[in-house]
């Protein structure tokens, strides 16, 4: 990476010899002008514009990879040194607006040139932003940057892991939207749509934009029931796409699901909440810090001491970090892939630990690629969300346990089977649930598993010939088709139980 320093505003990038750039070191102050894109400290003129290394590298990667971005908001995001990573679409547009030239990149040395020329980690100036293996996604390429073949495979493999996780997240989000739209049509009693349908049909490029902004407070048990059923059902389908979940024994599958379920119920709405004033739910409702006064007794008891802590301990750090969805899907996978979950067999622990390590590597490679200067700190701050998440999970379980123990209300059987019941109790794993967990996911996966890109996880299928024996099994046995099975919806609607957030 050459630091071309601006001796004159009339000197163009393609007129500077790479080997003579050091001649200007003593003539100009590289910090005289800030980066034209984000306002951070500049390191010279890059692609015709005074800019920092971060914006230079971002522009170069975007052009070389021909990446296309979308803005989650109104294409008017603020791009400064604090929030430049929040929206890649607006950042790239800012690069173009201030004068960065695509054609200037061709004057640099060919990024896929001889493997004997390239980046160095021994203090020598970098001649290229990335190695041949990175630019081409070729895991066999080895540059002269001192990195071995194993390390060179990290970036392309990590990118595949995150891409697959992102694809499955989008499919789950879309299915949530579809199920909510169907529930609204069913509630209206006519096949027509209501005023919210237009919002619900918005695309699901990201978890934050998959749902319309919430327009009413969550005030009824019906809202909580809908959220819990749909979220837990889709959690199972998502889990079946994560390698090596389908290779585990039935008992280990259920242990892993039970360990993760309460964390999932907290993570999903937390990521979609834009600020610390309210927790946004997928059915266009929200909960505020004092929203529990509008709920009935049991719902208020379950959420009163959880909602404020979710806002302070999960939502606030996410917003401070400007967490991207790529980071969020990795955080979800890390919470799910917990090899220390009580009761797991030794063989399952080994497989789960290997899968978790792949996600950890993918997350760090992504952060290092996008924000190299802040990578260690950002990586650590994301992982530090885990203790708060576990503490909130324990609080949620305690609330449910007290409710069930003192008979304050009937705890919903679906949540009870997922969160409260002992794994050694055979009633927690009825035959129908075992058959469902043994079947391929009903979500379309294109034959790709997030942690095993070359492996097939099965095609779209439905579970038939199963006689549900419990609330959980009845819910899980319902295939996630575009058109819901009326018989399964009837099973769900017939249960008059209570759910938590």
Swiss-Prot record:
SMART domains: HOLI (SM00430), ZnF_C4 (SM00399)
Keywords: DNA-binding, Metal-binding, Nucleus, Receptor, Transcription, Transcription regulation, Zinc, Zinc-finger
Gene Ontology BP, a term: regulation of transcription by RNA polymerase II
All copies of domain NR LBD, residue ranges: 157-422
Subcellular location: Nucleus
Annotated region described as Disordered, given as residue ranges: 109-152, 188-217
Keyword check for Zinc: yes
Compositionally biased spans, kind Polar residues: 114-123, 197-207
ZnF start-end (NR C4-type): 11-31, 47-71
Annotated CDD domains: NR_DBD_HNF4A
Matching InterPro entries: HNF4-like_DBD, NHR-like_dom_sf, Nucl_hrmn_rcpt_lig-bd, Nuclear_hormone_rcpt_NR2, Nuclear_hrmn_rcpt, Znf_hrmn_rcpt, Znf_NHR/GATA
Tissues in which the UniProt entry reports expression: Expressed in head, intestine and hypodermal seam cells.
Entry's Gene Ontology molecular function annotations: DNA-binding transcription factor binding; nuclear receptor activity; RNA polymerase II cis-regulatory region sequence-specific DNA binding; zinc ion binding
Phenotype of gene-disrupted mutants: Displays mild developmental defect, exhibiting slower larval growth. In response to hypoxia, only 25% of embryos develop to the L4 larval stage, by comparison with 86% of wild-type. Exhibits intolerance to hypoxia in hif-1 mutant background, with less than 2% animal surviving to L4 larval stage. Reduces the survival rate of hypoxia-exposed embryos to 25% from 86% in wild-type animals. Reduces the survival rate of hypoxia-exposed L1 stage larvae to 19% from 95% in wild-type. Leads to hypoxia-dependent up-regulation of nuclear hormone receptor nhr-67.
DNA-binding region(s), chain positions: 8-83
Induction (free text): Exposure to low oxygen environment (0.5% oxygen) triggers hypoxia-dependent responses.
Locus of motif 9aaTAD: 413-421
GO CC terms in record: cytoplasm; nucleus
Subunit structure: Homodimer. Interacts with nuclear hormone receptors nhr-80 and nhr-66; the interactions are direct. May interact with nuclear hormone receptors nhr-13, nhr-22, nhr-79, nhr-105, and nhr-256.
Functional summary from the UniProt entry: Orphan nuclear receptor. Regulates expression of genes involved in fat metabolism and in maintaining homeostasis of fatty acid saturation, such as lipid desaturase fat-7, and acyl-CoA synthetase acs-2. May form part of a negative feedback loop with fat-7 to limit mitochondrial beta-oxidation, in which it stimulates expression of fat-7 and acs-2, and in turn fat-7 indirectly inhibits acs-2 and other genes also involved in beta-oxidation. Acts in multiple somatic tissues, probably cell non-autonomously, to regulate response to a low oxygen environment (hypoxia).
Family assignment from sequence similarity: Belongs to the nuclear hormone receptor family.
Entry text on domains: The 9aaTAD motif is a transactivation domain present in a large number of yeast and animal transcription factors.
Protein name: Nuclear hormone receptor family member nhr-49
UniProt gene name: nhr-49
